[in-house]
Structures are given as structure tokens and as C-alpha cells.
From Swiss-Prot:
Residues covered by the Kinesin motor domain: 223-553
Signal peptide feature range: none
Molecular-function annotations in GO: ATP binding; ATP hydrolysis activity; microtubule binding; microtubule motor activity
Keyword Transcription regulation belongs to the record: no
Protein's UniProt name: Kinesin-like protein KIF2A
Pfam families: KIF2A-like_1st, Kinesin
Length: 706
């Protein structure tokens, strides 16, 4: 008899349930609990499977057509009510969506009709009528019951009335949504070559429960924060009828609808889901992005900390727009970028009583890193040298720090720096940044460093794949970007796990930002910007995978079974690496070797050899240029000495022995210095040849570039 209490509830059917927050949606019955007369249900929400145990009374109040018959056993002629069919809103990683089924709407209408049948309290009357009078041809059991007994004697309870009202509202809402979908379908351009994919994406989105991020959502504290920002389709993509394949249904979920094709040429969608700290859709302005990302880091620098904010993504995905400000044609409104918004909050915090008494001074620097070289954007792109002193502190020699008193001073510096930043035209963007731009806000107290906020607009990550280009300059650009992004990931790994060693020497970018990854009071935020177009799908997935790996590094190591820990090597292991990779040892090369070994899936031995050849070539280039500058300065002194010797020969009784001795000394010095310079130039030319040969040995089937 206990099983009869469950009525028509069976394992596997979908029932309406009410959540603690008042929401009503459908869930699947997974078990029937006879001991306490309850059922266990499960549903999928935001990619996670959730479940709860609900008593039968609550189930029957929302699903009256599933309630058991009262007192009188149903006759064999009484047909059971069909279980309602429904769809469940899902966000499932790797879900496939095949071409849309055209008869979806009638199925839904049938379910609506079945739920509107007679109330379960009338079922005993139907059964009794059938037993006494038999089945009347053309008259349903419900009609026969009404004819025999008249209207039911039981009155509807308030709960049932409320449920019926909710059901009526739900059906009206579904009809409105169906009408809206049909209207959108009429607006779709059927001439679009990707019309089928467009319909699949539209139908998939129609079943999602959208809850985007709003300014009312709380701001969580993260030592490492990773978020994603989607930009809208631009004019070029719209004219080419490109499709928007990115969906952001909630505040922390990003979905990519990747078009695929089967062997039989059937097209389908591979829906891939990623989760981050925050996800911003195309409607989110810069102010909202700043509020959840860089703004929580401002207070860190007032507490003697180091804060870093990166903008990462492919060319044209909106990095410079996010960091520098809104674009109107080629003109940029710097007042709406994260640079200026962070500066505004810095000056506001300076006025707080607890910080005002510190008498802090604010300075700003702006430089770029291009092909492994550092240039000062506030000093006519003067080339700078990056050195490490005896205290293992990295110094950028010659970098200008400008004192700023207000936000307007910061805006002027940003405009000066942006005007001379290295850029070029690419297929993705007519004004593409090809360098890492680093804007730093520095707090000093009595001349000593108090805190530093580094805001970095990274170069396009797709340039990291250009390591096999025929053009050397493009190869160097790609190699430096590829290496710096790998090093950046490993430095964030070390920061998130509080590891003692950080491979910051592996690239110029991480070397300059060394103090941002060292120390307990360091915080980092990464804003991954993505393009929504189907043509950019591969680069978008690479960006999301990179950002996802960075975020995975911040979780508890005990819960991260598939994440490889930081590998610390003994001197003997370093020697083994030397044998494996075939290179010598230096702090820079050791970090590069460890970096490549920890990313074996992305860096093949041939690619590592190329990176090592590029690093060696860049080092030799700096030495040759520095020695050439020294020879030039010595040449000026030699000219003065030789001029004095020639003037001495004009005298009648000059000392011939002294003249010959001094001239020989000058010539010997010239020969020694010039010979040394010539040998270095020969070695440099050999390094250029090695770099070119190494670029040709890179396996074209190597793993994708980050």
C-alpha cells in the first residue's frame, strides 16, 4: 500500500518543484522514499547537478495530476494521465546541439493540454460511474461522472487555487516566449550561409535561464582574479554576416558554440562551458568591468602591496579599449579606461584620514616591451636596459617617473604614451598593438617605494603562433609574446601556491614585473577579452583555455588532482636538463628550461630550441650594440690623442721616439678593441643563422600556441 501513496509518480519523470527562493521549475525524480513518504529529485543549474528531498504533499500541490485516487480503486477502463514532458535548462560542458526539430512546439502544447485535465479529486467519481453504468459510447468518464453526480462536493483549497494561478501564468509566459521566438525566426536572414548554425544557437539560447552580472552583485576578494569580457560584433563582422557564437548566461559562466561537421556532412554545435570569477557580456561598460576587477586592488598598494592587472586576448578583442578607454574612430577617450579609473580612485584614497597622514607622493611610468626590448613611452621611446642588482632587485635603468598631482596629469601621460606605442595593421584590426604596454602607478613615502599598481595591456596572443614566419621581425615578435605568456602563467602559478621560486627571468615581461609576483601582499587580476564572431572561434577558445588554466591554479592543490605541481630541481636534475635540452646554464636559461619543461604539452623540444636561440641572439645583440657604443666613444678620444701627436710633429725638434711610442700604443689599443668587436659581430651573425635554422625545425603539428 505504501507504493500506492506515490500515485502516478515514477522514477525518471519530470515534476514541478518549488525552490526556497520561490522559483518554480521542473526536476527529474530519481528515487521514491517509502519510509518518510518523500521523493528525491535532481536538476541541472548553471552546469552543476543539484538535488533535494521533497515530501509528497508538496509534490502533489504543484502536480495535482500525479496525485493518487482517493478511497475507490480505479477501474481498468480509467486511463492514467500521461506524465508531462519538459525540457530542463542546462549548461553542460561538451553538450552537442543537432539541427532543430520542427515539431517541438506541438509536443509542448500536448503537455499543456494534459496538465489542464480534470482534477485528481474527481477521479473516484469517474471510477464509480464506470463501474455502475459501464462505458458510454462517445462520453468520457469525467462527463459521465458529472452527469451522474453533478458538480463535485469538495471545494478547491487555497493552495490548489494558488497553484492553478501559477500554472496559468506559466503557460501564458511560455506562449509569449514562443511568440517571441517565432517573431525572431521571421527576422532571421535565411540567405546567411550559416543559417542552420544560427537557428541551432538561437534554439539553444531559448532554453537558458539568463542571470547576467549586475552592479548589485557582491564583490568577492581574490588574490588571483580571472574574468572574461565579451565585446559586441563590430561593423566588419556584421557586414560579413558573422555569427555571435558566445553566450554568457550568468555572472560567471561563458559558453562557446563551436560549429562542427560530421562525416556525413551533418552540422552540429559543440557547446563548451567555462567558469570564471566574473563574466561580462557585450553590454557591460568599462566602469562595471573596473568595479569587479581592478578597483578591489587599489587599496592593496596603500597597504604596502603590489597589484597587477592584465588585459589578455587576441588582436581586436578589446584589450586596449578596456585598459585605455573607449574608441571613436582612431580617437580614444582615455578618461573611461581602467588606467584613468584606477588613478581616480588612488587620488580619492589619498584624501582618507588614515592615508593622508602618510604624506604619500604619486608617480607614474609608461613603457612598452617589444621583441624583448624595453622602451620608455614618456621619453620619446628611449631604449632602456633591464638589470638585476646585487640584492636581486630588477632595475629598469633610465626609466622616467613623472610625478602626478591629479587625474588630468595621468590622462596627459596616457595620451603621450599611446601616441607612440608600437602598432601595425593586421587582418583583425587596422590599428593593432604589437607590444606589451605597462602603465604603473607608484606610491612613494619620503622617496622610498610604498606600493605599486601595474596595469598591462598585453600584445595579441595569436601573434605567439608566428614563430615559423619567413620574416625575422615577425618571428621575434611571436617568440617573445609566446614566451612571455608562458612565463606569465607560471609566475601566477607560483604566486597562487606561495612557492619559493618564481621563473620571472624566463621573459622580459615577467622580469620587469618581478616584484608583482614576490611577497605575501601581492594580488593579480586577469581580464581575458574575447571576440564573439564565429571566424574568431579558435582564438577565442585558446584565450578561454589559457584563462581557465590560470584560474585552475588558484584552487586548493588537494582538490586539483590533474594539476601538476611546481617542480623544484636539484643541481643534478639541472644537469640532466642540460643534457636533454642541449644548452648551457645561466639564470635566464635555467628559468626558460624549467618553464618549457612544465609546459611540455605546449612546447616541443624544437620550439624550446628556437626560444633559446632567440634569447641568445637578443643577449648577443645587446652586447654588440653596447660594445659598438663603447668603441665609438673611444674613437673620439683616439682622435683627440692623434690630433695632439700630429700637432707635436709640427714642432722643429719634436721627440721622434715619444711620437712613435704613443702612436704604436694607440694603434695597439685600436686593434685589440676593434678585433674583439669584430669577433662578437661574427658570433652575432652566427646566432642569427642559428635562429633562422631553428625556426625551420619547428614541428608544424606542435600544440596550439597559448
Amino acid at each position: 500500500m505504501a507504493a500506492a501513496n506515490f500515485g502516478k509518480i515514477q522514477i525518471g519523470i519530470y515534476v514541478e518543484i518549488k525552490r526556497s527562493d520561490g522559483r518554480i521549475h521542473q526536476a527529474m525524480v530519481t528515487s521514491l522514499n517509502e519510509d518518510n513518504e518523500s521523493v528525491t529529485v535532481e536538476w541541472i543549474e548553471n552546469g552543476d547537478t543539484k538535488g533535494k528531498e521533497i515530501d509528497l504533499e508538496s509534490i502533489f500541490s504543484l502536480n495535482p495530476d500525479l496525485a493518487p485516487d482517493e478511497d475507490i480503486e480505479p477501474s481498468p477502463e480509467t486511463q492514467p494521465l500521461p506524465a508531462p514532458s519538459a525540457k530542463v535548462n542546462k549548461i553542460v560542458k561538451g553538450r552537442r546541439t543537432v539541427a532543430p526539430v520542427k515539431n517541438d512546439t506541438p509536443a509542448r502544447d500536448n503537455r499543456v493540454a494534459s496538465s489542464a485535465r480534470a482534477r485528481p479529486t474527481q477521479l473516484p467519481e469517474q471510477s464509480s460511474s464506470s463501474q455502475q453504468n459501464g462505458t458510454v459510447s462517445g462520453i468520457s468518464p469525467v462527463q459521465a461522472a458529472k452527469k451522474e453526480f453533478g458538480p463535485p462536493s469538495r471545494r478547491k483549497s487555497n493552495c490548489v487555487k494558488e497553484v492553478e494561478k501559477l500554472q496559468e501564468k506559466r503557460e501564458k509566459r511560455r506562449l509569449q516566449q514562443q511568440e517571441l521566438r517565432e517573431k525572431r525566426a521571421q527576422d532571421v536572414d535565411a540567405t546567411n550561409p550559416n543559417y542552420e548554425i544560427m537557428c541551432m544557437i538561437r534554439d539553444f539560447r531559448g532554453n537558458l535561464d539568463y542571470r547576467p552580472l549586475t552592479t548589485a552583485d557582491p564583490i568577492d576578494e581574490h588574490r588571483i582574479c580571472v574574468c572574461v569580457r565579451k565585446r559586441p560584433l563590430n561593423r566588419k563582422e556584421t557586414l560579413m554576416k558573422d555569427l555571435d557564437v558566445i553566450t554568457i548566461p550568468s555572472k560567471d559562466v561563458v559558453m562557446v558554440h563551436e560549429p562542427k561537421q560530421k562525416v556525413d556532412l551533418t552540422r552540429y554545435l559543440e557547446n563548451q562551458t567555462f567558469r570564471f570569477d566574473y563574466a561580462f557580456d557585450e553590454t557591460a561598460p568599462n566602469e562595471m568591468v573596473y568595479r569587479f576587477t581592478a578597483r578591489p586592488l587599489v587599496e592593496t598598494i596603500f597597504e604596502r602591496g603590489m597589484a597587477t592587472c592584465f588585459a589578455y586576448g587576441q588582436t581586436g578583442s578589446g584589450k586596449t579599449h578596456t585598459m585605455g578607454g573607449d574608441f571613436s574612430g582612431k580617437n580614444q577617450d582615455c578618461s573611461k579606461g581602467i588606467y584613468a579609473l584606477a588613478a581616480r580612485d588612488v587620488f580619492l584614497m589619498l584624501k582618507k584620514p588614515n592615508y593622508k597622514k602618510l604624506e604619500l607622493q604619486v608617480y607614474a611610468t609608461f613603457f612598452e616591451i617589444y621583441s624583448g626590448k624595453v622602451f620608455d613611452l614618456l621619453n620619446r621611446k628611449t631604449k632602456l636596459r633591464v638589470l638585476e642588482d646585487g640584492k636581486q632587485q630588477v632595475q629598469v635603468v633610465g626609466l622616467q617617473e613623472r610625478e602626478v598631482k591629479c587625474v588630468e596629469d595621468v590622462l596627459k601621460l596616457i595620451e603621450i604614451g599611446n601616441s607612440c606605442r608600437t602598432s601595425g595593421q593586421t587582418s583583425a584590426n587596422a590599428h593593432s598593438s604589437r607590444s606589451h604596454a605597462v602603465f604603473q602607478i607608484i606610491l612613494r613615502r619620503k622617496g622610498k617605494l610604498h606600493g605599486k599598481f601595474s596595469l598591462i595591456d598585453l600584445a595579441g596572443n595569436e601573434r605567439g603562433a608566428d614563430t615559423s614566419s619567413a620574416d625575422r621581425q615577425t618571428r621575434l615578435e611571436g617568440a617573445e609574446i609566446n614566451k612571455s605568456l608562458l612565463a606569465l602563467k607560471e609566475c601566477i602559478r607560483a604566486l597562487g601556491r606561495n612557492k619559493p621560486h618564481t621563473p620571472f627571468r624566463a621573459s622580459k615581461l615577467t622580469q620587469v614585473l618581478r616584484d608583482s609576483f614576490i611577497g605575501e601582499n601581492s594580488r593579480t587580476c586577469m581580464i581575458a577579452t574575447i571576440s564573439p564572431g564565429m571566424a574568431s572561434c579558435e582564438n577565442t577558445l585558446n584565450t578561454l583555455r589559457y584563462a581557465n588554466r590560470v584560474k585552475e591554479l588558484t584552487i586548493d592543490p588537494s582538490a586539483a588532482g590533474d594539476i601538476r605541481p611546481i617542480i623544484h630541481h636539484t643541481p643534478s636534475q639541472i644537469d640532466d636538463l642540460d643534457t636533454q635540452w642541449g644548452v648551457g646554464s645561466s639564470p635566464q636559461r635555467d628559468d626558460l628550461k624549467l618553464l618549457c619543461e612544465q609546459n611540455e604539452e605546449e612546447v616541443s623540444p624544437q620550439l624550446f630550441t628556437f626560444h633559446e636561440a632567440v634569447s641568445q641572439m637578443v643577449e648577443m645583440e645587446e652586447q654588440v650594440v653596447e660594445d659598438h657604443r663603447t668603441v665609438f666613444q673611444e674613437s673620439i678620444r683616439w682622435l683627440e690623442d692623434e690630433k695632439a701627436l700630429l700637432e707635436m710633429t709640427e714642432e722643429v725638434d719634436y721627440d721622434v721616439d715619444s711620437y712613435a711610442t704613443q702612436l704604436e700604443a694607440i694603434l695597439d689599443q685600436k686593434i685589440d678593441i676593434l678585433t674583439e668587436l669584430r669577433d662578437k659581430v661574427k658570433s652575432f651573425r652566427a646566432a642569427l643563422q642559428e635562429e633562422e635554422q631553428a625556426s625551420k625545425q619547428i614541428n608544424p603539428k606542435r600544440p596550439r600556441a597559448v
